[in-house]
Amino acid sequence: MLLRSDTALVTGTGGGIGLAIASALEEEGAKVLRADVKDADLSQPGAAVKLAESAIRSLGQVSIFVHAASPPRRETQTALAVTEAEWRAMLEVNLNSGFLIAQALGRHMREKKIRGRMLFVTSLHADSPRNLPHYSASKAGQTMVMKELARALGPEGIRVNAIAPGAVPGAGFKGAPGLVDKIALGRVATPADIAPMAVAILSEKYGAYMTGATVVVDGGIALYNWIDPLEEA
């Protein structure tokens, strides 16, 4: 097993990609603390640091952190349609909480001399506007946070990377008509398509010399100039 000596905190495990990654880590021998909104509402002030501290207490030490949490969203929203509450919730969960948990666990790993690994689940939306301004901004921010953490923690032997899935139907995203025609492999992804790559990145066997990188797992959708339908809301 690739991760039999590891302990991991994974957010966003109520379903989808977060759940798939948590299950895959467990299959590879890791002891995993799963965190979903019912366990820690990361939209609330102070919740992120409390979750990190709880994970350290529960697991004894944390060697892996995966941030897959993201609040529900409408499928498309223009920049003029997003409400302040939606904007704040998206950035708080995706960006602020991800950074604060990683910061707390990075300090923990450094203090305990743990050669830890962190993984942010970002998105192709981080690189181009798709009528989801709050989501895209949060994912672009995650990418830069990942790179800053990779620079800061690399000398400590701690690796920080990101994985950017393509079209994965789930909460807030059902897939636009004709979307499959714009995917080279001819189908949308499932969480099970993403989890094995996450395991590889987090493992020392396959990812030992990798940090500060974003791995795209999109079935080839980025080969097309795919555009979500504009939907005024």
Language-model segments: residues:
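Conserved glycine-rich cofactor-binding loop
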Residues: 14
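A short, exposed helix-loop element centered on a Lys and neighboring polar residues
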Residues: 102-103, 147
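Substrate-binding pocket helix/loop in short-chain dehydrogenase/reductase
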Residues: 75-79, 83-88, 179
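Active-site loop of short-chain dehydrogenase/reductase
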Residues: 6, 61-62, 109-123, 155-158, ...
